[in-house]
């Protein structure tokens, strides 16, 4: 191999993005089982007098940051709906879709919702759902009573940039809170990396 080719190879390695589930500081995958975050720590919420909407990005890079039970619950959710996820992605011609767990909560009687109204804004581009996989029969009715909820998996054309900022919108309701979560995620990555070097995984948790 020529010196020019070696130089190009080194440059390419230096510019490579961290793999899924990697710590930017460590440059290697973070292990599972050391995280302490909950689903609520990763949730974005928007709402009004009719509805509250919760959005949880289901991204492999976030899984090592979650407490064991929370991570296992979300992985089971994805695994049990893998066939439907793959079908939606295949029809859309998308190899690696972004996935979010979306829950609608009724705040009054006969609260109606439109699943297609929810969007995310990534780098000034609006992404509407490629497909919606209902997780409850109530979701298809698009109507909720007080304290009732309906959930679904939302698939998007691009991976959700969980290491950067993005916006969640439902009509005129918007959340920019993900950017404010980034310091928490960075601290948890550092904590997980440190714990993994000094503590064995507690398989009984």
Feature-to-residue mapping (PLM):
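Positively charged n-region of N-terminal signal peptides that target proteins for export
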Residues: 1-5
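Bacterial N-terminal signal peptides
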Residues: 6-16
């Amino acid at each position: 191999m020529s010196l020019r080719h070696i130089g190009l190879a080194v440059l390419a390695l230096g510019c490579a993005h961290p793999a899924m589930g990697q710590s930017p500081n460590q440059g290697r995958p973070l292990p599972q089982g050391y995280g302490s975050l909950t689903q609520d720590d990763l949730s974005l919420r928007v709402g009004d007098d009719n509805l509250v909407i919760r959005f949880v990005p289901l991204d492999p890079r976030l899984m090592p940051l979650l407490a064991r039970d929370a991570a296992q619950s979300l992985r089971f959710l994805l695994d049990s709906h893998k066939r439907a996820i793959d079908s939606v992605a295949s029809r859309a011609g998308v190899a690696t879709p972004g996935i979010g767990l979306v829950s609608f909560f009724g705040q009054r009687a006969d609260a109606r919702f439109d699943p297609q109204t929810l969007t995310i804004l990534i780098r000034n581009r609006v992404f509407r759902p490629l497909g919606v996989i209902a997780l409850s029969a109530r979701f298809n009715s698009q109507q909720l009573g007080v304290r009732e909820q309906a959930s679904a998996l939302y698939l998007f054309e691009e991976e959700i940039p969980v290491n950067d900022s993005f916006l969640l919108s439902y009509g005129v309701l918007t959340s920019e809170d993900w950017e404010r979560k980034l310091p928490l995620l960075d601290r948890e990555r550092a904590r997980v990396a440190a714990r993994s070097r000094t503590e064995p995984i507690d398989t009984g948790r």
